[in-house]
Curated annotation (Swiss-Prot):
The keyword Glycoprotein applies. Involved in the detoxification of xenobiotics and in the activation of ester and amide prodrugs. Hydrolyzes retinyl esters. Hydrolyzes p-nitrophenyl butyrate (PNPB), triacylglycerol and monoacylglycerol. Shows higher activity against PNPB, a short-chain fatty acid ester, than against triolein, a long-chain fatty acid ester. Shows no detectable activity against diacylglycerol, cholesterol ester or phospholipids. May play a role in adipocyte lipolysis. Glycans are attached at N79. Residues 1-18 form the signal peptide. This is Liver carboxylesterase 1F. Pfam families: COesterase (PF00135). Expressed in liver and kidney. The active site is at S221 (acyl-ester intermediate), E353 (charge relay system), H466 (charge relay system). CDD domains: Esterase_lipase (cd00312). Disulfide bonds join C87-C116, C273-C284. It comes from Rattus norvegicus.
Length: 561
């Protein structure tokens, strides 16, 4: 008993740095946190891990639909050695997404809660206050509706590249993006959580061995979109110094909306709230339990597309809004004015963004459906509003993507390529051009590889599917069994590129294929079994859509490419 007491007293009165003989304890501005050391087979460098460190107050009660507030201080040593709950979401879908995307070998059972504003930290075990290592802040994807920090184990990236990895969480769905379009609930709560996490990093990361003057934000899909939003936001000035958007930028269809009122009214109606004023709606929704809001989310069936329902009257995402806080103007205006954080920026896509994962999770164009030209047009007309595409140009686009073939498989594959281009490829090229033209160092890539960890249901011809890059970025071939030497080598190369960029704003380094800067020649890097330079990513498709949409007047309340 006496020894236990003395041990706890010692933890409460001193900070332990990089001493594997005792668990790491670190001071934060709010109190001390206790972590743990984890080892990595084949690597002498172990990693100090802190899981579930609070960066804001629980967003409950009056803090629902409100900006995050600083965490309350604590006087004890907080145990941060277990995964925090993920933010409220459909548990079955969230668990499935985690199991598909995680880089770790073992499966973990997830918990979900409205109290979820926590972050996970992975730092080399020999860290000190003076280490000043590059910091890489990860923002997960999931359509602003699913996902969490703990899907991604940062130990491999941290150990192999001597960086501090911070994986953050942010409110999702109704909790993160409900907006009435006025002062009663402006929205963008999830983005404000991301900003709060970056402030926490500035105030605390030095004690974990990180350099607050060298912070890189990186994210994939909705996380890449979030990175793109944060690049444009005045709230993040000096909070980060480099950025990486993987498979998602600010023009990702469906994730940015101009008219929030219909969705707000639908949510209020489903909750049984009066809708006479915004104040009444917000007050009513704040009284609902977490479970009641979750049931509304499930009924809205967010992310799921269906050819059986009227997609014009459905809401597939609860979206980011131009709120005059996070985003002072429409992103197109901000980019045109070149008034944003012109930090070095990597933007990339995967070769077949709509190859298998997204069609499977979102429920459109199943692999076993045979399509003729007429059916393809009908199907895409149902989704035109989501993608911001005028319905009358869909037949022209179908002709382009079916390439003269009447074969049902080729038509289906053409539709998937169509959706991949309008969702990811074209927006990524356009944002890269805008960033380049503002004078910021810009790099582009296209990832082309079939990971050995893919679902057995996935067709073998889908190479470079949505989220495939995550396995390489987080070292899945090193953590999990069954990877080939080629796959391990690819992962080490990608981690080296990302970490070099985090160190100095340039991904290049000794022993790596040269990655050219994205300038007027529009050179980029193809990353895969063979990694090589190429030029003008998706040039033909960009030209096609640019010319096609230039002939059209903007459609109200939709995000056109």
């Amino acid at each position: 008993m006496c020894l236990s007491f003395l041990f706890l007293v010692s933890l409460a009165t001193c900070v332990v740095y990089g001493n594997p003989s005792s668990p790491p304890v670190v001071d934060t501005t709010k109190g001390k946190v206790l972590g743990k050391y984890v080892s990595l087979e084949g690597v002498t460098q172990s990693v100090a891990v802190f899981l579930g460190v609070p960066f804001a107050k629980p967003p409950l009660g009056s803090l629902r639909f409100a900006p995050p507030q600083p965490a309350e201080p604590w006087s004890f040593v907080k145990n941060t050695t277990t995964y925090p709950p993920m933010c409220s979401q459909d548990a079955a879908k969230g668990q499935r997404m985690n199991d598909l995307l995680t880089n770790r070998k073992e499966k973990i059972h997830l918990e979900f809660s409205e109290d979820c504003l926590y972050l996970n930290i992975y730092t080399p075990a020999d860290f000190t206050k003076n280490s000043r290592l590059p910091v890489m802040v990860w923002i997960h994807g999931g359509g602003m509706t699913l996902g969490g920090a703990s899907t991604y184990d940062g130990r491999v990236l941290s150990a192999y590249e001597n960086v501090v990895v911070v994986a953050i969480q942010y409110r999702l769905g109704i909790w993160g993006f409900f907006s009435t379009g006025d002062e009663h609930s402006r929205g963008n709560w999830g983005h404000l959580d991301q900003v709060a996490a970056l402030h926490w990093v500035q105030d605390n990361i030095a004690n974990f061995g990180g350099d607050p003057g060298s912070v890189t934000i990186f994210g994939e899909s909705a996380g890449g979109f979030s990175v793109s939003v944060l690049v444009l936001s005045p709230l993040t000035k000096n909070l980060f110094h480099r950025a990486i958007s993987e498979s998602g930028v600010v023009f990702l269809p469906g994730l940015l909306t101009k008219d929030v009122r219909p969705a707000a009214k639908q949510i209020a109606d489903m909750a049984g709230c009066e809708t006479t004023t915004s104040a009444i709606i917000v007050h009513c929704l704040r009284q609902k339990t977490e479970e009641e809001l979750l049931e509304i989310m499930k009924k809205m069936n967010l992310i799921k597309l269906s050819s059986q329902r009227d997609n014009k009257e459905s809401y597939h995402f609860l979206s980011t809004v131009v709120d005059n806080v996070v985003l002072p103007k429409d992103p197109k205006e901000i980019l045109a004015e070149k008034n944003f954080n012109t930090v070095p920026y990597i933007v990339g896509i995967n070769k077949q963004e709509c190859g298998w994962l997204l069609p499977t999770m979102m429920g459109f164009v199943p692999a076993d459906v045979e399509l003729d030209k007429k059916m393809a047009i009908t199907l895409l007309e149902k989704f035109a509003s989501l993608y911001g595409i005028p319905e009358d140009i869909i037949p022209v686009a179908i002709e382009k993507y079916r390439k003269g073939s009447d074969d049902s498989i080729k038509i289906r594959d053409g539709i998937l390529a169509f959706i991949g281009d309008v969702s990811f490829s074209i927006p990524s090229v356009m944002v890269s051009r805008d960033h380049r033209d503002a004078g910021a160092p810009t790099y582009m890539y296209e990832y082309q590889y079939y990971p050995s960890f893919s679902s057995p249901q996935r067709p073998k011809h889908v190479v470079g599917d949505h989220a495939d890059d995550l396995y390489s970025v987080f070292g899945a071939p090193i953590l999990r069994d069954g990877a080939s030497e080629e796959e391990i080598k690819l992962s080490k190369m990608v981690m080296k590129f990302w970490a070099n960029f985090a160190r100095n704003g340039n991904p290049n380094g000794r022993g790596l294929p040269h990655w050219p800067q994205y300038d007027q020649k529009e050179e980029y890097l193809q990353i895969g079994a063979t990694t090589q330079q190429s030029q003008r990513l998706k040039a033909e498709e960009v030209a096609f859509w640019t010319q096609l949409l230039a002939k059209r007047q903007p459609q109200p309340h939709h995000n056109e490419l």
